[in-house]
């Protein structure tokens, strides 16, 4: 069972598509670096919708997999 996405992952899922549309030949590693830098530049207020989205996913995950315990 996969862990639920965190706020960065929720945000980056949408942003990654935008970058790939603009630069289809860009390597995944470079896209990830850009996403990380852009996320760090966002204001906390801009992150709120993604934090809330991640929290919804976390709660759903807890309901769906009540006995789940992360084991790396």
Swiss-Prot record:
State the DNA-binding region(s): 1-69
User: What GO biological process terms does the UniProt entry carry, in alphabetical order?
Assistant: brain development; camera-type eye morphogenesis; negative regulation of transcription by RNA polymerase II; neuron differentiation
What is the first-listed, main subcellular location in coarse terms? Answer: nucleus
Q: Per the record's keyword annotation, is Nucleus included, yes or no?
A: yes
Record SUPFAM superfamilies: HMG-box
GO cellular component terms given for this protein: nucleus
Q: Which UniProt keywords apply?
A: DNA-binding, Nucleus
A Pfam family found in this protein is HMG_box
Compartments annotated for it: namely: Nucleus
Q: Which GO terms describe its molecular function?
A: DNA-binding transcription activator activity, RNA polymerase II-specific; RNA polymerase II cis-regulatory region sequence-specific DNA binding
Name recorded for this polypeptide: SRY-related protein ADW2
């Amino acid at each position: 069972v996969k862990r639920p996405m965190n706020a960065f992952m929720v945000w980056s899922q949408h942003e990654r598509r935008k970058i790939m549309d603009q630069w289809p030949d860009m390597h995944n590693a470079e896209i990830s670096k850009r996403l990380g830098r852009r996320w760090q530049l966002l204001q906390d207020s801009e992150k709120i919708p993604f934090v809330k989205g991640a929290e919804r996913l976390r709660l759903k995950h807890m309901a769906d997999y009540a006995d789940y315990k992360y084991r790396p």
